[in-house]
């Protein structure tokens, strides 16, 4: 089989399964409205949970940062790309979340890959929730360590896997809020079992940070858990992009030596770090509390109105509200019908989610209004 035949076969298989991914160029993709092909849609696919991507204070901070520092960092943080803006953001994040150190990364994917690649050796074991994000599971699969997956949120199964003899160290990996189901991990129980077996806990709280807990401190703070490794991302609750790893001083020093994604990548622009500092200030403020309260009310309204639809509603109190349809083609058809009626909704299919669980992944944000939720419910009921 030639290279072209190999590529064609893979694409043909995706098409046959109604699983071919496509991108749509949009004129506006974050916030309440999505604009594509000169048409405006209510946007129920954005991860901009607090509606901060267009916040004037954050936009102003980015502009001022660009005027002060330029539009790029100029290099890796190990060479010339670590500015006083990066340093200030790291210190503010560490203080906010109660850690000694924070290290910035260009994306959550890079942060997860970097930590696992740097920390894990052949004699070690990774025990991951089987529904963990692709960045975590891919990094674990590529590492020299043994990878074992426990049944989603099943602490008993986790304990059984941890009890199996391991010559090295054990790292338990999970998410705070799961990206495709919107449910939360029982972090207190997971941490207890992990500590009983002398392991470390790594939590990716991409979808909880900024959105839940006191001052938006996220899933771990809400559940009174402090994992050894906490990954937070800035493309969801913060409304920007990038990520950080929160850890001890010695782990931070270790990652600065051995995390190749950090060492060999150009760091985020200092202007972006300034925007993130402004976003953090909003998240921690009374305004941040008000946005979280509004989002919670929108979620309650949606869940109350969707109960009698012929879909499986995930057990989620988060901004992620999936409606599990099952069949790939049915999910695609529903998403298209909703778009035709002015609601931009994305169909998520395998391999992103398990086979037979294709879904409409609906996301609600503080930028929405109650009438937007009512319109979504009206359209869903008309197509259920």
UniProtKB/Swiss-Prot annotation:
<feature type="binding site">
    <location>
        <position position="21"/>
    </location>
    <ligand>
        <name>substrate</name>
    </ligand>
</feature>
<feature type="binding site">
    <location>
        <position position="207"/>
    </location>
    <ligand>
        <name>pyridoxal 5'-phosphate</name>
    </ligand>
</feature>
<dbReference type="InterPro" id="IPR015421">
    <property type="entry name" value="PyrdxlP-dep_Trfase_major"/>
</dbReference>
<feature type="modified residue" description="N6-(pyridoxal phosphate)lysine">
    <location>
        <position position="236"/>
    </location>
</feature>
<feature type="binding site">
    <location>
        <position position="352"/>
    </location>
    <ligand>
        <name>substrate</name>
    </ligand>
</feature>
<dbReference type="GO" id="GO:0030170">
    <property type="term" value="F:pyridoxal phosphate binding"/>
</dbReference>
<protein>
    <recommendedName>
        <fullName>8-amino-7-oxononanoate synthase</fullName>
        <ecNumber>2.3.1.47</ecNumber>
    </recommendedName>
</protein>
<feature type="binding site">
    <location>
        <position position="179"/>
    </location>
    <ligand>
        <name>pyridoxal 5'-phosphate</name>
    </ligand>
</feature>
<comment type="function">
    <text>Catalyzes the decarboxylative condensation of pimeloyl-[acyl-carrier protein] and L-alanine to produce 8-amino-7-oxononanoate (AON), [acyl-carrier protein], and carbon dioxide.</text>
</comment>
<keyword id="KW-0093">Biotin biosynthesis</keyword>
<dbReference type="InterPro" id="IPR015422">
    <property type="entry name" value="PyrdxlP-dep_Trfase_small"/>
</dbReference>
<dbReference type="InterPro" id="IPR022834">
    <property type="entry name" value="AONS_Proteobacteria"/>
</dbReference>
<feature type="binding site">
    <location>
        <position position="133"/>
    </location>
    <ligand>
        <name>substrate</name>
    </ligand>
</feature>
<dbReference type="GO" id="GO:0008710">
    <property type="term" value="F:8-amino-7-oxononanoate synthase activity"/>
</dbReference>
<feature type="binding site">
    <location>
        <position position="233"/>
    </location>
    <ligand>
        <name>pyridoxal 5'-phosphate</name>
    </ligand>
</feature>
<keyword id="KW-0808">Transferase</keyword>
<dbReference type="InterPro" id="IPR004839">
    <property type="entry name" value="Aminotransferase_I/II_large"/>
</dbReference>
<dbReference type="InterPro" id="IPR015424">
    <property type="entry name" value="PyrdxlP-dep_Trfase"/>
</dbReference>
<comment type="similarity">
    <text>Belongs to the class-II pyridoxal-phosphate-dependent aminotransferase family. BioF subfamily.</text>
</comment>
<keyword id="KW-0663">Pyridoxal phosphate</keyword>
<dbReference type="InterPro" id="IPR001917">
    <property type="entry name" value="Aminotrans_II_pyridoxalP_BS"/>
</dbReference>
<dbReference type="GO" id="GO:0009102">
    <property type="term" value="P:biotin biosynthetic process"/>
</dbReference>
<dbReference type="InterPro" id="IPR050087">
    <property type="entry name" value="AON_synthase_class-II"/>
</dbReference>
<dbReference type="Pfam" id="PF00155">
    <property type="entry name" value="Aminotran_1_2"/>
</dbReference>
<dbReference type="InterPro" id="IPR004723">
    <property type="entry name" value="AONS_Archaea/Proteobacteria"/>
</dbReference>
<comment type="pathway">
    <text>Cofactor biosynthesis; biotin biosynthesis.</text>
</comment>
<comment type="subunit">
    <text>Homodimer.</text>
</comment>
<feature type="binding site">
    <location>
        <begin position="108"/>
        <end position="109"/>
    </location>
    <ligand>
        <name>pyridoxal 5'-phosphate</name>
    </ligand>
</feature>
